[in-house]
């Protein structure tokens, strides 16, 4: 595949409509017209509200005769109180849709607002483990368009969102099968201005998604194929995107790789995310960075005995040695190459939190799909390793 191939505009439907290619943001007015949208609410995170892509989106919508409000109060780790404020904004502005633009936090925030925008249910009634909420036709979720501006979370196609429960200090997955984006718009131009550290952190998140999803037990050839192709794209293009941030092919490859890995984790995730969710909820750490630090610890715990899985992942990354040790060494080399810190302590997570983080991680839905079950004591040892020396 050539660089030109990667930059060729494409329209896919898998599992939702996806419009991919440089400059596709300019088509957002046409998409709104096709969906019958007149007054969407733009949802983004606090760090993105003053960035050029927000004003550009507003301008393109205005030129197309579409009025739009803006809600930009989503934190890097979205909180339940912010979602409530966003719901009030949606209702008071008589909005008919949500356009979630930004990183994973913005898209998760937009999805969470959608869940309660037209009903009086508590947000936590949509928690993954809860009985599925019955949503009637008169309470149908608003139309949702997702526009990622980072290449990492893969949140743009998902029906799930991660939100911090402020009362419990824990992250939970909220979900409803009827919540599906009507369009994911993937424009690599929107990621060109992403700083090197965020390119690295969000890109490493995509790698974690691909690896964890592929390692989840069970027969799911669709997700497995997407995970391996996503891993191949990320392994090839992430170092390039960090070193040469204006390389459009690298940005495009990363955006597609991230999307594929995000679709793949319909299959599930694992202990990297179980721990990372709780660290992020308590210490507000950047999600992709936290995942990247923890990853080698969990690989050393999970991979022995999984040589059949490791071989295919090694092939995807272009390795000639498909042993478990060689695969872990390559992952660690890539993390070193993009300057990922070697421990959670280096990003300000205190050493005395291991016990309570482990206790919370055991309750995370991602722990239930990890390929190797961890006891409570083992989980605490994993957290301690990530705190002290992950690689």
List each model region and its residues.
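Glycine/threonine-rich beta-strand-loop-alpha-helix active-site module
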Residues: 81-188
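An N-terminal, well-structured beta->alpha segment
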Residues: 1-70, 389-391
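Short, amphipathic C-terminal "tail helix"
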Residues: 351-391
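Carboxylate- and glycine-rich phosphate/diphosphate-binding segment that chelates Mg2+/Mn2+
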Residues: 158-267
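Gly/Pro-rich interdomain helix-loop hinge
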Residues: 282-353
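Glycine-rich phosphate/pyrophosphate-binding beta-alpha loops
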Residues: 152, 259-291, 364-369
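N-terminal small/polar loop signature for handling phosphorylated ligands or for N-terminal nucleophile
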Residues: 49-122, 239-251
């Amino acid at each position: 595949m050539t660089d030109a191939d990667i930059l060729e505009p494409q329209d896919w439907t898998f599992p939702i409509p996806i419009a991919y290619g440089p400059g596709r943001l300019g088509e957002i007015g046409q998409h709104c017209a096709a969906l019958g949208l007149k007054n969407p609410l733009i949802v983004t995170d606090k760090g993105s509200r003053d960035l050029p892509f927000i004003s550009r989106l507003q301008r393109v919508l205005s030129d197309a005769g579409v009025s739009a409000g803006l809600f930009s109060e989503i934190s890097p780790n979205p909180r339940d109180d912010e979602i409530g404020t966003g719901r009030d904004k949606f209702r008071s502005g008589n909005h008919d849709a949500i356009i979630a633009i930004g990183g994973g936090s913005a898209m998760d925030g937009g999805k969470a607002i959608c869940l309660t925008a037209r009903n009086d249910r508590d947000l936590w009634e949509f928690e993954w483990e809860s009985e599925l909420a019955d949503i009637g036709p008169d309470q149908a979720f608003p139309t949702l368009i997702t526009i990622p501006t980072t290449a990492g979370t893969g949140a743009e196609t998902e029906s799930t969102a991660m939100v911090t429960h402020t009362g419990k200090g824990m992250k939970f997955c909220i979900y409803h099968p009827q919540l599906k984006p009507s369009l994911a718009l993937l424009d690599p131009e929107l990621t060109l201005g992403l700083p090197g550290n965020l390119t690295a952190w969000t890109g490493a998140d995509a790698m974690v998604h691909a690896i964890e999803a592929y390692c989840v037990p069970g027969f799911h050839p669709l997700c497995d194929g997407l995970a391996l192709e996503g891993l191949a794209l990320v392994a090839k293009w992430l170092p390039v995107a960090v070193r040469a941030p204006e390389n459009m092919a690298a940005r495009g490859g990363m955006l597609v790789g991230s999307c594929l890995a995000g679709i793949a984790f319909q299959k599930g995730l694992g202990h990297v995310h179980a721990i990372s969710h709780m660290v992020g909820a308590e210490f507000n750490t950047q999600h992709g960075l936290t995942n990247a630090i923890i990853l080698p610890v969990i690989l050393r715990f999970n991979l022995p005995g999984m040589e059949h899985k490791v071989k295919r992942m090694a092939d995807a990354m272009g390795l000639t040695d498909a042993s478990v040790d060689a695969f872990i060494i390559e992952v660690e080399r890539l993390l070193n190459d993009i300057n990922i810190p070697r421990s959670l302590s280096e990003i300000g997570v205190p050493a005395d939190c291991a016990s309570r983080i482990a206790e919370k991680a055991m309750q995370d839905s991602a722990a239930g799909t990890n390929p190797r079950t961890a006891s409570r004591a083992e989980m605490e040892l994993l957290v301690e390793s990530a705190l002290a020396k992950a690689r």
